[in-house]
Amino acid sequence: AAAAAVSGAKRSLRAELKQRLRAISAEERLRCQRLLTQKVIAHRQYQKSQRISIFLSMPDEIETEEIIKDIFQQGKVCFIPRYRLQSNHMDMVKLASADEISSLPKTSWNIHQPSESDTREEALATGGLDLIFMPGLGFDRNGNRLGRGRGYYDTYLQRCLQQQGAKPYTIALAFREQICPQVPVDDTDVSVDEVLYVDAA
């Protein structure tokens, strides 16, 4: 019964957050994006990380393009998610350059990602990750995260623990509209180390 209550609470919170995200103006999106990019670039954890995984944004997520460009400018190694649709399996595969993104095929969710037949270095096979930037629909101040319900990141972080013996540092990028008093969680949900967002103008 408890599990059903949690999944019901997650469902209704997801619907509410999607609505809140749709209401954010284009100007506000740009403002948050710029300020968050600056916050990330100045962040100690980012500066000391060499192998970084970052998501390519969906329309209702913080745009990560400028951060990706900076990762390459700083000579760091960039990995992006390759989701296996119809499953909860995801790999973090190496990106050769920021310019390469636009030439990658698009998934049914309209996100660029390398195809399954495109052989690329997977982060965990070549030394793990120092830092993972996490997408999500909602977060609370304790780092609890509400994803889109597929479990890709929770499953991947478990793999990191098994294969590199430690969880990479995790930072969520969010609009303040995504910060909730409390996110409903269960045992499989992995919390994030830090949620970065921008306060009201």
Swiss-Prot record:
Cellular location(s): Cytoplasm
InterPro entries: FTHF_cligase (IPR002698), FTHF_cligase-like_sf (IPR024185), NagB/RpiA_transferase-like (IPR037171)
Keyword entries, A-Z: Acetylation, ATP-binding, Cytoplasm, Folate-binding, Ligase, Magnesium, Metal-binding, Nucleotide-binding
Keyword check for Cell inner membrane: no
EC numbers on record: 6.3.3.2
Gene Ontology molecular function, alphabetical: 5-formyltetrahydrofolate cyclo-ligase activity; ATP binding; folic acid binding; metal ion binding
Protein residues bound to substrate: 56, 61, 148-152
Record-listed ATP binding positions: 10-14, 145-153
Pfam families from the UniProt entry: 5-FTHF_cyc-lig
Family designation: Belongs to the 5-formyltetrahydrofolate cyclo-ligase family.
Protein function: Contributes to tetrahydrofolate metabolism. Helps regulate carbon flow through the folate-dependent one-carbon metabolic network that supplies carbon for the biosynthesis of purines, thymidine and amino acids. Catalyzes the irreversible conversion of 5-formyltetrahydrofolate (5-CHO-H(4)PteGlu) to yield 5,10-methenyltetrahydrofolate. It can also use 5-formyltetrahydropteroic acid (5-CHO-H(4)Pte) and 5-formyltetrahydropteroylhistidine (5-CHO-H(4)PteHis) as substrate.
Protein name: 5-formyltetrahydrofolate cyclo-ligase
Organism: Oryctolagus cuniculus (Rabbit)
